[in-house]
């Protein structure tokens, strides 16, 4: 599953 950390990396 995708990690929230990767999502924040886009920010």
From Swiss-Prot:
InterPro entries recorded: Tachy_Neuro_lke_CS, Tachykinin_dom
Gene Ontology, cellular component aspect? extracellular region
Q: Report the Pfam families cross-referenced here.
A: Tachykinin
One Gene Ontology term of the biological-process aspect is:
tachykinin receptor signaling pathway
Keyword Secreted part of the UniProt annotation: yes
Does Ribosomal protein appear among the keywords?
A: no
Identify residues that carry Methionine amide: 11
Subcellular location, principal: secreted
Supply the alphabetized keyword list.
Answer: Amidation, Neuropeptide, Secreted
**Where in the cell does this protein reside?**
Secreted
Family label: Belongs to the tachykinin family.
Known function = Tachykinins are active peptides which excite neurons, evoke behavioral responses, are potent vasodilators and secretagogues, and contract (directly or indirectly) many smooth muscles.
Q: What is this protein called?
A: Ranatachykinin-A
């Amino acid at each position: 599953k995708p990690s929230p950390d990767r999502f924040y990396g886009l920010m």
